[in-house]
Amino acid sequence: MATAFWLLLFLLGSLHVLTAAQNSSQSEWPIHDNGLSKVVQWDHYSFYINGQRIFLFSGEFHYWRIPVPALWRDILEKIKAIGFTGFAFYSSWAYHAPNNQTVDFSTGARDITPIYDLAKELGMYIIVRPGPYVNAEASAGGFPLWLTTGAYGSTRNDDPRYTAAWEPYFAEVSEITSKYQVTDGHYTLCYQIENEYGQQWIGDPRDRNPNQTAIAYMELLQASARENGITVPLTGNDPNMNTKSWGSDWSDAGGNLDTVGLDSYPSCWSCDVSVCTGTNGEYVPYKVLDYYDYFQEVQPTMPFFMPEFQGGSYNPWDGPEGGCTEDTGADFANLFYRWNIGQRVSAMSLYMMFGGTNWGGIAAPVTASSYDYSAPISEDRSIGSKYYETKLLALFTRCAKDLTMTDRLGNGTQYTDNEAVIASELRNPDTNAAFYVTTHLDTTVGTDESFKLHVNTSKGALTIPRHGGTIRLNGHHSKIIVTDFNFGSETLLYSTAEVLTYAVFDRKPTLVLWVPTGESGEFAIKGAKSGSVAKCSGCSNIKFHRDSGSLTVAFTQGEGISVLQLDNGVRVVLLDRQKAYTFWAPALTDNPLVPEGESVLVSGPYLVRTARLARSTLTLRGDSKGETLEIFAPRKIKKVTWNGKAVEATRTSYGSLKAILAKPPSVELPTLNGWKYSDSLPERFPTYDDSGAAWVEIDANHMTTPNPNKPATLPVLYADEYGFHNGVRLWRGYFNSSASGVYLNIQGGAAFGWSAWLNGHFLGSHLGSASIQQANGTLDFPANTLNTEGTPNVLLVVHDDTGHDQTTGVLNPRGILEARLLSEASDNNDDDSPGFTHWRVAGTAGGESDLDPVRGVYNEDGLYAERVGWHLPGFDDSKWATVNGTSLSFTGATVRFFRTVIPPLSIPENTDVSISFVFSTPNVNNTSAGNTSAFRAQLFVNGYQYGRYNPYVGNQVVYPVPPGILDYNGENTIGVAVWAQTEAGARLNLDWRVNYVLGSSLDAGRLDLSFVAIAYVYIFECLQL
């Protein structure tokens, strides 16, 4: 009676829902193109490529955050292996334009053509996002820092000065991309103009009052893209649901793009969730947002497209070591990505898929060195539960062709017999295949709920499961229940177990289903009459029920893999979650959509990167820890190779091939010892000669600035106006008077710091705070620190910056806003109060001239050690003092540079080895009088600055450094610059560790590192004092 009652209730509710859906939909949605080609088209449902609908599942990576081109293959193969059909990347204007006369897309890791070539080889569509502004938690949002002086206007508008600045870069990246478009047989799918530029309207977008300046800017960008060969759709991304910009469905105002999408970070883009309340409201873990109504209102004739959906969160300076992985982990991936499918999203790109590292000075002040982003692929390139959980959905969306065209017929609790569980019904109007996306009614609770689901099928209305048991949602999870799911020539009438994937071998399909470990499932396959258990590993309670025209199978699956064989030739593989995590479907083709007969199924390894089939030989590449390999593939296969070596494979009774992979060897790292050191702050002494090429004279002629943020005192002491744009800068101010002190107000961004010395005597510091961007202080001049009359006094101010601000803050200056000598006259506002006679400033050696084009101008800053090349391989430190022991410690407020050279590492062949450096502060004295953690350290590895360690301000202690920066076959030069901000000095240790060792086709010890050859050359002749 209960079942009949619920079924009747469901049928009555469905009648209303279906009628409402039909009344609000169109029988024919327009198919759009951009008028240049019909290769890429789109409509209300999805994108088309060459007439075939696609579900675009993509993930973002930034090549400039992993400046080792040989490792781009590693990241992109992992993105492909997860089941994605595409990837996205920002191009960084800053990375390619060290000055306003240079656009470099050819040197080292600045050559982006390997990315396009890899996309073609691996079979993935690309969303190219060239800016000019990209945000990305990059310094100045990816703008080159020479743009931040104010001389180019306020930016992101149609100011001719700004236009002249971006046009050479934008033309170059467009021209390069134009050779790799899907319209010409390559895989660039679309080209995003600007980023999160929701400025089309003045005021409320519903008033549709056009912002003509923003419209003119967008039209200039579009014209440039087209003039330089871009023929694929031009796209945009709204930053949130409030801006409603650039879509022709919303308005026919100027500047509209071909297609637009919506960015969303429902759990906050930062580990500091307070920064998101203005967009998302109060943070509640696992609270989902409604997108369906937004898309229906704003872009009903376009695909529901999310160019950025939350793949993790960046970690601010005061965030936890390792980031906030628990906030956006495997459960987040399970729930939120399925929720989006229930919202009818058919194109989604995760930001980030791989974050990488903010090496050098590329970060904005909001984050430290790590850009791990809690992404599915970690900063150290490892994969874990979040990656595997995402794969469970991605492989499904790749094989579920009917998901590319669905109407949402309803959503609510009427679909279930448990009022705590809701479902959204998506149905393909052409095939009648349906997808029921089930979640908790309140997604924030995560309770253990069991339920039955009311569905409509080609066999009529059913309540499933039909033969006992229930469907279960245990925790912050979602399940997609399919009906009339087509696989090969067969039809899955329904399944309460989720579909992972399927493949067709020898004209017979193999269907792969999974459930959480220990849960039950039930599925029905049309046309089958009987079945048998070919393998039972963890299975129980398997029962076959013959129904009218179909066979229903009920089962429970514990940890393991079970295989069923049906009489119609269908093979069904049953997996629990853990086995599903390491079950792969590598493509045999470079077609991103992977036709059903163009893949094999592989179980066991940590990662399966690629598969190729030639005659009777199956060639697999991947990473392993010594697992058992099981392959479901065509019967013609007689030989299997793994990473180029034949493996002894035996055939099972149910048709698979099994082999045991070798365990990788262990790797031990040598001790980091043999340290030497030298003082790196000679500039604090009045006898230092600052007349060299490294120093720029600042005199009374520099009394104005184009920056709208004016200084309080003159001359202008904004570092960017003198060509020094990142990291540490040194200012030497000269005066002749008998001042009693100095007032300084300095701006360097969140977490920055400064210190000051008078004639070699330490005066004081701003130690820094994650929340303070600008800091002032009054410093008294102690007795006997001033020189006698006739000898000038020298005030040295050392400050760093943590990057330039983003969005509207890109013009916020970096440098000294106010420098005022104090005396009795100044206290009385006397015109004869003392002043500085002149200043000199030093920063990155060569300024904008890019002396080291491989590492680039963002790698070094202005410390003496960097200006003269102590951090580079090849420097002769034989006359330096030797550190006793392994602690890099000293007393006194100064900068000391430590350096050691480590003999070649013993990295075995055919492995991938990941290594991190780990800082610690032993026996730290945190009293105000003797704080030995009040220092700022920079880690250099073979000349690359690969970590900023500020223990007084931030919490990051682990710094992954990839192969290619670390030389796995030669010596490694390790340097640490330590700036002690108190007289107590600094105490720190540096160690390193192996994150993992895998048997791997990557062969990390033998990468092609030809791109770094110039970077390892000793370049003293270019460096400056």
UniProtKB/Swiss-Prot annotation:
Keyword Magnesium tagged: no
CC terms in the record's Gene Ontology section: extracellular region; vacuole
Binding-site residues for substrate, renumbered to this chain: 90, 135-137, 195, 265, 373
MF terms in GO: beta-galactosidase activity
EC number: 3.2.1.23
Keyword DNA repair applies: no
EC category: hydrolase
Alphabetic keyword roster: Carbohydrate metabolism, Disulfide bond, Glycoprotein, Glycosidase, Hydrolase, Polysaccharide degradation, Secreted, Signal
Protein's GO biological process: galactose catabolic process; polysaccharide catabolic process
Catalyses which reaction(s): Hydrolysis of terminal non-reducing beta-D-galactose residues in beta-D-galactosides
Matching Gene3D superfamilies: Beta-galactosidase, domain 2 (2.102.20.10), Beta-galactosidase, domain 3 (2.60.390.10), Galactose-binding domain-like (2.60.120.260), Glycosidases (3.20.20.80)
Pfam family membership, one: BetaGal_ABD2
Glycosylated sites: 23, 100, 211, 411, 456, 736, 776, 884, 925-926
SMART domains in the cross-refs: BetaGal_dom2
Chief location category: secreted
Disulphide bridges: 271-324
Active site as annotated: 196, 308
Signal peptide: 1-21
Subcellular location: Secreted
Listed InterPro entries: Betagal_dom2, Betagal_dom2_sf, BetaGal_dom3, BetaGal_dom3_sf, BetaGal_jelly_roll_dom, Galactose-bd-like_sf, Gly_Hdrlase_35_cat, Glycoside_Hdrlase_35
Family the UniProt entry places it in: Belongs to the glycosyl hydrolase 35 family.
Function of the protein: Cleaves beta-linked terminal galactosyl residues from gangliosides, glycoproteins, and glycosaminoglycans.
Protein known as: Probable beta-galactosidase B
